[in-house]
Swiss-Prot record:
It comes from Aneura mirabilis (Parasitic liverwort). InterPro entries: PSII_PsbL, PSII_PsbL_sf. This is Photosystem II reaction center protein L. The chain crosses the membrane at residues 17-37. Disulfide bonds: none annotated. Its main location: plastid. PSII is composed of 1 copy each of membrane proteins PsbA, PsbB, PsbC, PsbD, PsbE, PsbF, PsbH, PsbI, PsbJ, PsbK, PsbL, PsbM, PsbT, PsbX, PsbY, PsbZ, Psb30/Ycf12, at least 3 peripheral proteins of the oxygen-evolving complex and a large number of cofactors. It forms dimeric complexes.
Length: 38
């Protein structure tokens, strides 16, 4: 219970993966919109 490092690392990794997921969804949305509007 006196080891905040692993918990902090886990939260940081989760936040990073969430940002990568949002970026991937954004890129896919842009590519699909370009495909449909052309």
């Amino acid at each position: 219970m006196t080891q905040p490092n692993p918990n902090k690392q886990s939260v940081e990794l989760n936040r990073t993966s969430l940002y990568w997921g949002l970026l991937l969804i954004f890129v896919l949305a842009v590519s699909f919109s370009n495909y449909f509007f052309n």
